[in-house]
């Protein structure tokens, strides 16, 4: 069995207010995306990595992210699609894994994943077919319509989904193919498995595993990076 990692890094991140893809913004002394790739490149349980970004950014990605850090497991860059779901599907087509191989899909803008979470996520995907990392929500959640609260879900049942999300290759490949055929858009890759009636295991993750989306997130990520913790590769 081989373990593949797909890293979608095609989003411009308009909420960041930057003129470049947020994955190329500096975190410490190197780009955000290079931290993310390093987490998996250094992990002994990972075999192959594919980075998904706009084709027009291939030279930039190689120059700023791939070449300077001598990654050993990056097998190639994959052209992103119009939406994240399209980008992941392109990545699945590129990796050409076997049916029973495991594929982890991880946001390029999540550079602080604790490496210790990778092995249990892969193991759960081997056993169940699909597994994701997440954390219990801290705040009370409200369902709102037209500015008015409809209801308050039981917070003890709510988890915030993160990445990586891990799957048997054949399962997630077929889910994406059916979603394309039926014009179904999922909010994440695990939701495609749920849509088809499949079960997805939840692995408790870390609140440090943030997705860098806003300028405030970048400040918080830098603070985490400067603080010893379980996220360091």
Swiss-Prot record:
GO terms for biological process: isopentenyl diphosphate biosynthetic process, methylerythritol 4-phosphate pathway. It comes from the Bacteria. It comes from Syntrophotalea carbinolica (strain DSM 2380 / NBRC 103641 / GraBd1). Coiled coil: none annotated. The record marks 15, 22 as: Transition state stabilizer. Catalyzes the formation of 4-diphosphocytidyl-2-C-methyl-D-erythritol from CTP and 2-C-methyl-D-erythritol 4-phosphate (MEP). The gene is ispD. Pathway: Isoprenoid biosynthesis; isopentenyl diphosphate biosynthesis via DXP pathway; isopentenyl diphosphate from 1-deoxy-D-xylulose 5-phosphate: step 2/6. The record marks 155, 211 as: Positions MEP for the nucleophilic attack. InterPro entries: IspD, IspD/TarI, IspD/TarI_cytidylyltransf_bact, ISPD_synthase_CS, Nucleotide-diphossugar_trans. CDD domains: CDP-ME_synthetase. Its EC number is 2.7.7.60. It catalyses: 2-C-methyl-D-erythritol 4-phosphate + CTP + H(+) = 4-CDP-2-C-methyl-D-erythritol + diphosphate. Belongs to the IspD/TarI cytidylyltransferase family. IspD subfamily. Keywords: Isoprene biosynthesis, Nucleotidyltransferase, Transferase. GO terms for molecular function: 2-C-methyl-D-erythritol 4-phosphate cytidylyltransferase activity. It is an enzyme of class 2 (transferase). Pfam families: IspD. This is 2-C-methyl-D-erythritol 4-phosphate cytidylyltransferase. Signal peptide: none annotated. NCBIfam families: ispD.
